[in-house]
Amino acid sequence: MENNKTFICISNYFKGADFLIHLKELGNTVYLVTSETLRDSPWPHDSIDEVFYMNGLDTDWNLDHLLLGIGNLMKSNKVDAIVTLDDFDVEKGTYLRENLRIDGMGQTTGRYFRDKLAMRMRAKSCGISNPNFCSLYNDHDINTFADTVDAPWVLKPRSEASASGIIKVYDKETLWIHINEMGNNRFKYLLEQFRPGDVYHCDSIVLDGKVLFSISSKYLATPMEISQGGGIFRSANIPYNTADDKE
């Protein structure tokens, strides 16, 4: 086909089968990069031109090896787009696009989606309400935050999804115990005021700066409750034009 394009799809979870099938049905060349542990998963191989397997789980992938592999593939294949199929793969896609100069979301923009500190700083600069927060770079800034912002607070990994790895603290002494335990990795976290209450999420499709579609949902149990007490993440759609939806 004249409009045939080459897509590299990345996923460290088994998902996106329908997307891969549809890409192939449109006449495109489809490559998949996934984890070796998913080799036996029921991928739609008839719709994939070739599968490449990376050792380790998500956080164990060697990005230099990934870059070298895709770079070698590009010696004889023009790559038009890199598509990440899972939230945890966003960094991989932005890393490859930046290094290989492929169109799409780069690392700076990608951090607004995956780096909680960058996300909050961006939202604040746009006038969007945030809980009070602080990076963990500077001791003076941390002490000022603890002395001026009411507890409880939460220490959050900047790169983890949802409420994974969050630590809730109630006083300054305990806060510093946790920060000191992080050692040189403390910069990977941020400090934020805990705000109790219901938690919502809004999913949307935006094209050329215009919101084409959006839907709001409410968690049936907050991510913090699930993280601390176990269970399954569940949410329910908010009916259109209700008070919660408009807010």
Predicted segments, located by residue:
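ATP-grasp fold ATP-binding core
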Residues: 123, 146-169, 186-197, 202, ...
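Short amphipathic alpha-helical segments and helix-helix/interface helices
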Residues: 19-23, 120, 143, 179
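A conserved helix-loop-beta module that forms one wall/lid of the active-site cleft
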Residues: 98-165, 172
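Hydrophobic anchor at the start of a short beta-strand
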Residues: 30-31, 130-131, 189
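Glycine-rich phosphate-binding loop signature in dinucleotide/nucleotide-binding domains
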Residues: 72-79, 147-149, 184-185
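ATP-binding N-terminal substructure of ATP-dependent carboxylate-amine bond-forming enzymes
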Residues: 1-108, 140
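ATP-dependent carboxylate/phosphate-activation module, predominantly the ATP-grasp catalytic core
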Residues: 173, 193-247
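Short, charged, surface-exposed secondary-structure boundary motifs
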Residues: 40-44, 61-65, 112-118, 165, ...
